[in-house]
């Protein structure tokens, strides 16, 4: 069991006094994540801007755990909470999107993906329409190479601005990001703060039509009005996660208040009172049943984090990787 956030702040008394952002002890992560489940952050920090974040990183000893989150769309937080600091990049300090030249946009890491799609439409830049259908923020899109409709984040990235654990600035090229399918090999210790995108000129009517198609498709096949974290598992090579989940009889499967959506069975939803334990147990049950049915091991796309409640544990399904 972790100590209180107040106790942690007391240990750092004076070191954080110059910060302009907001420090909040013992804040429920269920207020932040789209699943609306999970235990508290020991201390939540919302920096005002990159300079404030840098000052915070320089002040906090490296042995204290630190987790950075964006808008909380693909996070499953365990019920025992998250020790140390959870840093949430705010829309005010990190959510702007601006056109910097004819073919380039700069976006803060907390900008919703949809905002980037809208800015690209206004600028007449094509091939950002896929962001219109991704329920997340740009920081997460950079970290996991988010994509849809045959387009991926890596195709648009010029450079990414980031801070390391010591608060020092780094600028990473597209190659530095080490992109692969739903993955970046950039150091997990780097905190992305903004990105420079490159687009190609397009007709606004065509871009708007593509965005409308993305939105229509999403509303037709995904549970967009439910409490969900988006796609639960990555697509295995040569097939789709939802197909394997469906073939294993897991469409609509429930554990407590957690359910695999009837509409799209690779989406896990909180039907009202799910705990983090319910959600993770459901996910591991699905992985086991899919492996038993098809020999395919599904890999989580949703990020799981935090501590189990005292006395709780989930044995991760360890199927053979093929």
UniProtKB/Swiss-Prot annotation:
Active site: 182, 231, 301
InterPro entries: FAD-bd_PCMH, FAD-bd_PCMH-like_sf, FAD-bd_PCMH_sub1, FAD-bd_PCMH_sub2, MurB, MurB_C, MurB_C_sf, Oxid_FAD_bind_N
Gene Ontology molecular function: FAD binding; UDP-N-acetylmuramate dehydrogenase activity
Subcellular localization(s) per the UniProt record: Cytoplasm
Disulfide bond keyword on record: no
Any single biological process term in GO: cell division
Listed pathway(s): Cell wall biogenesis; peptidoglycan biosynthesis
Main enzyme class: oxidoreductase
Xref: PROSITE patterns: FAD_PCMH (PS51387)
Record keywords, A-Z: Cell cycle, Cell division, Cell shape, Cell wall biogenesis/degradation, Cytoplasm, FAD, Flavoprotein, NADP, Oxidoreductase, Peptidoglycan synthesis
FAD-binding PCMH-type domain segment(s): 36-202
Main location: cytoplasm
Catalytic activity annotation: UDP-N-acetyl-alpha-D-muramate + NADP(+) = UDP-N-acetyl-3-O-(1-carboxyvinyl)-alpha-D-glucosamine + NADPH + H(+)
Pfam (any one): MurB_C
Cofactor(s) the record lists: FAD
Keyword Cell wall biogenesis/degradation attributed: yes
Enzyme Commission no: 1.3.1.98
Family: Belongs to the MurB family.
PANTHER family: UDP-N-ACETYLENOLPYRUVOYLGLUCOSAMINE REDUCTASE
Function: Cell wall formation.
Name under which the protein is recorded: UDP-N-acetylenolpyruvoylglucosamine reductase
Name of the coding gene: murB
